[in-house]
A protein has these predicted regions:
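Single conserved hydrophobic/aromatic residue that forms the stacking wall/gate
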Residues: 1-7, 11
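Generic detector of short, aliphatic-rich beta-strand segments that form the cores of beta-sheets
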Residues: 9-10, 69, 187
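Helix-hairpin-helix
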Residues: 14, 21-69, 96-99, 123-128, ...
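Intrinsically disordered, low-complexity glycine/proline-rich and charged
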Residues: 60-86
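C-terminal non-catalytic scaffold/interaction domains in large multidomain proteins
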Residues: 77-172, 176-200
Length: 200
């Protein structure tokens, strides 16, 4: 059945992610997050271009980690004679939103994040949502200029170390662990730095 094949695919993707994570010495979630693996198991991308249509996979991640995943998916599709959904081949990556581009450009110019939020009519936490999406899709950004301005260096190191040693990048878990000492915003800011440096 379809759902059984999708489950098998998901398990094979997870195993591969685990192998890569050991080999590259990065946490599994840095390679691809669970929702990305689930999307791969339902749409079966078999080229790097198609892989970039998967939520949370940008050009950077596709190039870095994608090759072994698409080979695995290709094998699975052939072995199980799976009909792949057509729409995946049609969609393109061209719809990267103007907002993302403008955020990346402003960060490159070291504009303060609260100012970027204001310019784009966003709440600060909405801006962080956007930046997280940018980083998860494999684009490297450097917000050190802002972090060093608003946080103490040892606080940054403390949160960074937490993510380095953690099994998950889950925000709720981090807040539970660190929330007594740090605000949610501080934790999210350092998590962005961590993901950008580790994953990209």
């Amino acid at each position: 059945s379809t759902s059984r094949r999708q489950r098998q695919m998901c398990i094979r993707d997870r195993d591969l992610r685990k192998k890569l994570s050991k080999r590259l010495e990065v946490p599994p979630f840095v390679i691809f997050q669970d929702p990305s693996l689930e999307a791969m198991a339902t749409t079966y991308p078999v080229t790097l271009e198609e892989l970039q249509n998967i939520p949370g996979v940008g050009a950077g991640k596709a190039k870095r980690y994608g090759k072994e995943f698409i080979e695995l998916i290709k094998r699975h599709v052939e072995e199980n004679e799976i009909e792949r959904p057509e729409d995946l081949r049609v969609r393109t990556v061209a719809n990267k939103s103007k907002l993302k581009v403008s955020i990346i450009q402003r960060i490159d110019r070291k504009v303060a994040l609260d100012e970027i939020a204001m310019t784009n009519g966003l709440e600060f936490n909405e801006l962080l949502d956007e930046i997280e999406a940018i980083v998860y899709s494999g684009t490297r950004i450097n917000i050190d200029y802002f972090l060093n301005d608003v946080m103490d260096e040892d606080h940054i190191d403390d949160i960074y170390e937490y993510f380095k040693d953690s099994e998950t990048d889950d925000l709720e878990d981090a807040i539970e662990e660190l929330g007594g000492d740090y605000t949610e915003e501080e934790i999210r800011l350092v998590r962005i730095k961590f993901l950008s440096e580790m994953a990209n």
